[in-house]
């Protein structure tokens, strides 16, 4: 590849690290997350009554959309660049835009639905159900977040290195038989966010699903929550692909290796951020290690 791969890796890792230093969970979760959800619902999200399955599903979508830019969902934005790297003709640009989004949504829905059923049947015994706070150390639900997002972060980093041909690409052979495998895998990862998500409004939904004991409601609510998470991602992808797709595609293909660099950078920034934020910065809350942060909110 006619680029210095070390530079791409270094700058991407630096970008992911810088994002963890600057990230303000109170601002993103409360101001943006709660604010957007409350605006959609028309009342304070924290006081939203889920008196029926329909009300719960409406809350699920609103809180999913509101949680688009929370730390547990930021890795999903790394899915946009790999999708843009795919070839598509000018005449059928819109038609060719839909299958990648469809497979991404399918993978996401599969994991979300299964976990929704698990939450409905066994949720009262899972860490995400608990409202307890740890006076020192980490609560069980944060330990669960560390494990889930740590694994997701490492997977994203590996995919970034694979895009640069530094490690073997596990999807390359499958892609020849199933061209949309990468979109499906990204969907599976986005769906798995629910397994580790500590976002307050999501846990509010989780408790309602667990208390209901209704697997069908759990599946629908969790799929709807995940769909809300990717609305912004889908809009950005459609705008870049359809409205500016010709210019974007020409720019990506103008230089050999540019598509791979963009894909790798997106995966590496998202992966480094996800791993460092959830497995290193979070650990610093216990006092075991020190991690640099800039408090601005």
Model regions: which residues?
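Hydrophobic alpha-helical segments characteristic of multipass inner/organellar membrane proteins
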Residues: 1-297
């Amino acid at each position: 590849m006619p680029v210095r791969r070390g530079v791409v890796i270094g700058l991407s890792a630096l970008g992911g690290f810088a994002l963890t230093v600057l990230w303000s969970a109170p601002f993103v979760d409360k101001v943006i997350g709660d604010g957007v959800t409350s605006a959609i619902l028309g009342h304070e999200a924290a006081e939203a009554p889920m008196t029926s399955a329909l009300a719960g599903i409406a809350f699920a979508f609103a809180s999913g959309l509101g949680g688009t830019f929370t730390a547990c969902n930021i890795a999903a934005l790394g899915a946009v660049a790999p999708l843009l790297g795919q070839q598509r003709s000018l005449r059928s640009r819109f038609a060719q835009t839909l299958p990648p989004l469809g497979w991404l949504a399918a993978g996401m829905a599969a994991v979300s639905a299964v976990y929704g059923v698990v939450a409905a049947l066994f949720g009262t015994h899972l860490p995400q159900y608990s409202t307890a706070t740890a006076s020192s150390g980490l609560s069980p639900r944060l330990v669960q977040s560390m494990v889930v997002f740590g694994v997701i972060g490492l997977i994203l980093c590996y995919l970034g290195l694979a895009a640069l041909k530094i490690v073997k690409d596990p999807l390359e052979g499958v892609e020849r038989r199933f061209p949309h495998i990468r979109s499906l895998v990204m969907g599976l990862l986005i769906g798995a966010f629910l397994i580790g998500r500590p976002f307050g409004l999501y846990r509010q939904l989780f408790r309602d699903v667990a208390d209901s004991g209704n697997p069908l409601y759990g599946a629908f609510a969790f799929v709807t929550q995940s769909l809300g998470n990717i609305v912004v991602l889908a809009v950005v992808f459609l705008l870049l692909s359809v409205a500016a797709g010709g210019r974007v595609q020409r720019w990506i293909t103008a230089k050999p290796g540019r598509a791979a660099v963009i894909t790798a950078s997106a995966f590496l920034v998202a992966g480094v951020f996800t791993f460092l934020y959830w497995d290193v910065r979070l650990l610093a809350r216990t006092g075991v290690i020190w991690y640099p942060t800039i408090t601005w909110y």
